[in-house]
Amino acid sequence: MNKNQIKQNSLKAWLLATRPKTLSGAAVPVLIGIALAYSDISSEFGAEYFNWVPAVLCLLFAFVMQINANFINDFFDYANGNDDTERRLGPLRACTQGWVSVDAMKRAIALTTVIACVVGLPLIWFGGLEMILVGVVCVVFCFLYTTHLSYMGLGDLLVLVFFGIVPVCITYYVIYCSVRYPYLAEDYVPHYCTWQVFLASVACGLVVDGLLVVNNYRDRENDREDGKLTLVVRLGARNSRRLFLALGIVACALGVVFWMNGHLLAFVLPVLFLVLHVYTWLKLKGARPLSESRAAWAATMNNCLGEAARNILVYGLCVVIGLLILL
């Protein structure tokens, strides 16, 4: 079916609106947090004491919040006039194309926000009342990113925090809090977070930020005209390409913490990700300028965007396999 012939508010329209390719960025941090918790709990207590309930809830919460963020971005970019079809270089968007009506998108934003809250509420049982604060902050920043913060060049920092530190560390935290080992001393304090977990979360955030850098690199001329001062706009083209390359290198270098904690494969396997990352960087570097061919530029950049999403998934799988393979 031609995308221009999609029936409004149809199942296919909503599927496109969820932006399935972005979901790897939501899943990978949680999967890494789960793998870290499973590894530590198995070695300290035994695999039978790992609780899958909070793990599944964290994964569902991440998926719903990512879809919620995509809906919010779709709606507000349309409302602010930032999705002009003639200027747009990226994939087409639901509201702008009329695939989803504005009223339906508003309802979808409200519904996914409620679903995220419902999915997240049981985590209070495992992680305590502080999980309420975590959930509220996640929801608030979903709205603030599109409406304000992305225009201030804070997008990359938010990705590091909300696609790295928060999901990895919080997932690890709530799973470890769920351990009910029968012989624990009353004054026992579980490892709610370790340096391995924190550095792994930073590495994950850097990898996911590569996706945002490619997206903003593609759109930098339009963003500059719209007054959207992303980090790419501030750095310029050459330094942005250097930033993209550095994100992958630093993320893999941080993986030395896995080796130091007895998980050599979790350090070695991400080399596969790094090879793919460098290949994507070479494509960015060799792309024809936008001024020469708008169509060729858009095609190359969107291809790089798809590769960046794939690379995130490859990185996550390499780390997860590396953490679990020795158990």
Short names for language-model regions:
Residues V64-L89, G210-V232:
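Acidic (Asp/Glu-rich) catalytic motifs at the cytosolic membrane interface
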Residues L160-R220, R238:
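Functional transmembrane core segments of multi-pass inner-membrane proteins
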Residues M1-L57, F61, G155:
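Topogenic membrane-insertion module of multi-pass membrane proteins
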Residues A27-G33, L158-Y172, R234, T300-V319:
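Small-residue-rich segments of transmembrane alpha-helices in multi-pass membrane proteins
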Residues R93-P182:
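Intramembrane alpha-helical segments
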Residues T85-F126, K228-H263, G306-L313:
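Multi-pass membrane catalytic core of lipid/isoprenoid biosynthesis enzymes
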Residues M260-I325:
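Extended hydrophobic alpha-helices typical of membrane-associated regions
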Residues L31, E44-F75, I132-F143, P190-V214:
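Membrane-embedded alpha-helical segments that form the functional core of polytopic membrane enzymes
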